[in-house]
Every structure is written in structure tokens, then in C-alpha cells.
Swiss-Prot record:
NCBIfam families: MerR. CDD domains: HTH_MerR1 (cd04783). Keywords: Activator, DNA-binding, Mercuric resistance, Mercury, Metal-binding, Repressor, Transcription, Transcription regulation, Transposable element. GO terms for biological process: response to mercury ion. InterPro entries: DNA-bd_dom_put_sf (IPR009061), MerR (IPR011794), MerR-type_HTH_dom (IPR000551), MerR_fam (IPR047057). The lineage of its organism: Bacteria, Bacillati, Bacillota, Bacilli, Bacillales. Homodimer. The keyword Amino-acid biosynthesis does not apply. It comes from Bacillus cereus. This is Mercuric resistance operon regulatory protein. Residues 5-24 bind DNA. Residues 2-71 form the HTH merR-type domain. Mediates the mercuric-dependent induction of mercury resistance operon. In the absence of mercury MerR represses transcription by binding tightly to the mer operator region; when mercury is present the dimeric complex binds a single ion and becomes a potent transcriptional activator, while remaining bound to the mer site. One of its GO terms (molecular function) is mercury ion binding.
Length: 132
């Protein structure tokens, strides 16, 4: 079955411009065209767009998705390649979690030192943030 760009957009929950953008980036292949120039997309493109959206939901950037699709598209790709890619993403997420925990601790500390009845120019939160 083939889909025009509007049908593909509706089916995948994206807009037409997103599809064109992904084409320019090479995330999805350039589609066949009708004699009148309409783009006609395959079910394979539908599956690929669903994959891209799911990866974005999991926190992958378009650059990371492009690299991942490069692994998927290689004929000689092995499951180990996906495993290695996943390990790198897990390590990246763990670093981000540690950074967020550090920021949370700092903000909790600032919140505890904030007397609510002081004027803004005496606020320890602002004083601390301006010093660093």
C-alpha cells in the first residue's frame, strides 16, 4: 500500500513538514513520485517513522537516531551493534540523572535557606546565584 504525504502524516501523528525535514536529513528515504509529482510512501516508511517517534520518546536526539538507523540499515549489522549503542545511551542518561540530582540538591539547599519574609534584595537565593 502507498500513502500520500498527508495520509502518512495522519497515520504517523506528525505533520507534513516533519516528513519533508526527515527526508532532507536522510532519516527516511526519498519516496517514489507519481507522474504529477506527488510523493508516495511505502509501509516501510510508516514503520520507520514510528521507530523515529518512539526513539524520540525515549530521549534520543535526531542525530542519535540517524546513527542508530545507520546501524539498522547496514546489511552486516549485528545485534551487538545495537547493544553497544544502547550501553552508550544508558551511560549518557546516568550522567544526566546525576547532573539533575546535583541541581536538585543545590536548589533544595537554597530553598531551605530562604526566609520568606525578607525583601528580594536580601534573598539568599539571589545572592548565592549571583556569586557563582
Amino acid at each position: 500500500m502507498k500513502f500520500r504525504i498527508g495520509e502518512l502524516a495522519d497515520k504517523c501523528g506528525v505533520n507534513k513538514e516533519t516528513i519533508r525535514y526527515y527526508e532532507r536529513l536522510g532519516l527516511i528515504p526519498e519516496p517514489e513520485r507519481t507522474e504529477k509529482g506527488y510523493r508516495m510512501y511505502s509501509q516501510q516508511t510508516v514503520d520507520r517513522l514510528h521507530f523515529i517517534k518512539r526513539m524520540q520518546e525515549l530521549g534520543f536526539t535526531l542525530n542519535e537516531i540517524d546513527k542508530l538507523l545507520g546501524v539498522v540499515d547496514r546489511d552486516e549489522a549485528k545485534c551487538r551493534d545495537m547493544y553497544d549503542f544502547t550501553i552508550l545511551k544508558i551511560e549518557d542518561i546516568q550522567r544526566k540523572i546525576e547532573d539533575l540530582k546535583r541541581i536538585e540538591r543545590m536548589l533544595m539547599d537554597l530553598k531551605e535557606r530562604c526566609p520568606e519574609n525578607k525583601d528580594i534584595y536580601e534573598c539568599p537565593i539571589i545572592e548565592t546565584l549571583m556569586k557563582k
